[in-house]
Amino acid sequence: MDFARARKPHTVRFKDDGLIPNHPRWPLIIYRNAVAFDESLDAAAVIEDLFEANGWGDSWRDGIYSYVHYHSRIHEALGIASGKGRVRFGGNKGRIFTLKAGDIAVLPAGTGHQCLSADDKFLVVGAYPPTGTYDECTSAEHRRGALKAIPKVSAPRKDPVYGTGGPLLKLWKKSK
């Protein structure tokens, strides 16, 4: 059964704010209502299976940290399995989005993110492409190495939601 719905992506590019580098070329991608599931299914498992089918693994289930952080050596997909939360992307000077069940955000390496508030049902499934190394950057001491590492993280071969024909491949390829 196919749970992914065709959706036009919402994209936002963030500038380096002096603490959070963000990605120098590629935008944050948000797919609204990208995943459909009914109450009889384990929504988190549906998202995990979707990510895994598209080559994004090492999945986890939790919330999003309440402090600003980013990953300098890997991209990240965040699928909302239940509830809703207000998440700021791009660092302290970034933008706030309300994410709800069925939404998926795909963050290029370097994109700052933090949860500002969430309801009690807010559950996120995170996953990563097969290339890259997980790290967590939170302070100015990480910045120098991050600025060198972020542009070296290769574009994924598959969109975590739509696979080889997904919008991510075009958006991240053409945004140079």
What is each model feature region?
Residues 63-77, 92-93, 99-100:
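A short beta-loop-beta micro-motif enriched in histidine and acidic residues
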Residues 1-69, 169-176:
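A short, N-terminal "cap"/entry segment at the start of jelly-roll beta-barrel domains
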Residues 99-119, 128:
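Conserved metal-binding segment of the jelly-roll/cupin
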Residues 56-57, 63, 82-84, 92, 116-176:
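Double-stranded beta-helix
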Residues 71-88, 106:
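Short, conserved beta-strand element in jelly-roll/cupin
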Residues 74, 87-97, 114-115, 130-133, ...:
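A structural preference for long, well-packed, hydrophobic secondary-structure segments
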